A protein has these predicted regions:
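Secretory pathway targeting signatures of secreted, lumenal, and periplasmic proteins
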Residues: 34-40, 55-59, 69-74, 195-254
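Bacterial N-terminal signal peptides that target proteins for export
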Residues: 1-8
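N-terminal "mature-domain start" segment
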Residues: 28-67, 173-202
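Hydrophobic helical h-region of N-terminal Sec-dependent signal peptides
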Residues: 9-14
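C-terminal motif of bacterial Sec signal peptides marking the signal peptidase cleavage site
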Residues: 16-19
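Bacterial signal peptide processing site
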Residues: 21-23
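Signature of long, low-cysteine stretches enriched in small and polar/charged residues
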Residues: 75-82, 88-138, 142, 246-302, ...
Length: 338
């Protein structure tokens, strides 16, 4: 583990030079990677980025969590304050504009070290606040791709944590439906952060169901709960039956489809949970889109909870909205205990 962390080198010289400056907030979208490299290196750098950031939302068409925007080295100066910047080069050809750029960015000793040893350099807040900056400087494709297994999960965690930090500030800090949040806590013993613009579609707390939504695009988040441990946390068949019956029971006019249906064990806010994802479709109209659910038992409140999210946004990007809803769902917390 120590060795792996050592592989993620820090651009110390720039931190020393720039660390005392007051930096403005990083620019750009939270689902876009700015990748700066010369044309001959694009395919290799693309394969590296794709192999690290391989999470995909099926809508049902595949939609990556991060879009890749390639920029030639001469455009670097105008985009260096973007939120997610990757600067890459393969080989040491001094006529390669990407190599020229990296040689300007790195001290000679560090430049040679990346070619001979670890090809990845990573840091935070280099030119802007809440920025992630990655340098990829490899001698060859083989050297670069060989570095992926040791770094993949660590790098993904850095980027996903930064996404959560920046997006939480965007969706929660300006205004929230605090009165609804307080009512949920007092009435149901749990609450969650509800951003301004989200409306209560249905409050059936007497039977353990609460549903909020937002337009432009259409987004739904619902919570269903029951007293006691009503699921078998080990038996996937039991969870599957719970999921398949959910939309027709609580939404009535939609159902889940078996295309790209996926169930996996994991955690929801440090509680063991099932994570279920797939595609929903309307029973009445040609409509559909992605959904995501978490099912878990909370021992402190002695209740089983099911949080479900779905979106309808035909022909447009959906992944960033699904990830925003995931942040809303994960703001869920129990406020009353047994």
């Amino acid at each position: 583990m120590k060795k792996n962390h050592k592989l993620i080198a820090i651009l110390s010289i720039y931190i020393l030079l720039l660390g005392c400056e007051n930096k403005r907030e990083a620019l750009g979208a939270d689902n876009e990677l700015i990748v700066v490299c010369a044309d001959p290196d694009k395919d290799i750098i693309y394969d590296f980025v794709q192999s690290v950031f391989d999470d995909t939302l099926f809508t049902p068409q595949p939609e990556p969590y991060f879009k890749i925007r390639f920029v030639k080295p001469e455009g670097y100066i105008d985009l260096k304050e973007q939120a997610y910047v990757v600067v890459g080069a393969i080989g040491d050809d001094i006529h390669n504009d990407g190599v020229k750029l990296i040689k300007k960015l790195l001290p000679e000793e560090q430049y040679q070290s990346t070619l001979e040893n670890d090809p990845i350099l990573f840091t935070h807040d280099l030119y802007a606040s809440n920025q992630l900056f990655l340098i990829v400087n490899a001698k060859s494709r083989d050297q670069l791709m060989a570095s992926v297994p040791a770094k993949k999960e660590w790098l993904k965690n850095q980027y996903y944590s930064q996404f959560a930090k920046r997006q939480s500030k965007y969706i929660f800090e300006n205004a929230r439906r605090v009165e609804v949040e307080k009512e949920l806590s007092e009435k149901n013993g749990w609450t969650m952060k509800i951003p301004w613009g989200w409306e209560v579609i249905k409050d059936s707390s007497d039977v353990g169901f609460f549903w909020i939504g937002k337009e432009m695009p259409f987004q739904w988040v619902s919570i269903q709960w029951e007293d006691g441990k009503t699921i078998d946390v080990v038996d996937g068949l039991d969870i599957g039956n719970t999921i398949w019956s959910y939309p027709e029971t609580f939404y009535e006019h939609i159902r889940f489809h078996d295309y790209k249906f996926k169930m996996e064990k994991g955690y929801f806010n440090r509680i063991k949970a099932w994570k279920i994802s797939g595609i929903w479709e309307s029973i009445e109209e040609p409509q559909g889109g992605p959904f995501l659910s978490y099912i878990f038992y909370d021992k402190a409140s002695d209740k089983t909870y099911h949080l479900n999210m779905l979106i309808y946004h035909p022909g447009e990007d959906k992944s960033i909205f699904m990830r925003q809803m995931d942040l809303i769902a994960k703001s869920f917390r129990v406020t009353k205990w047994v």
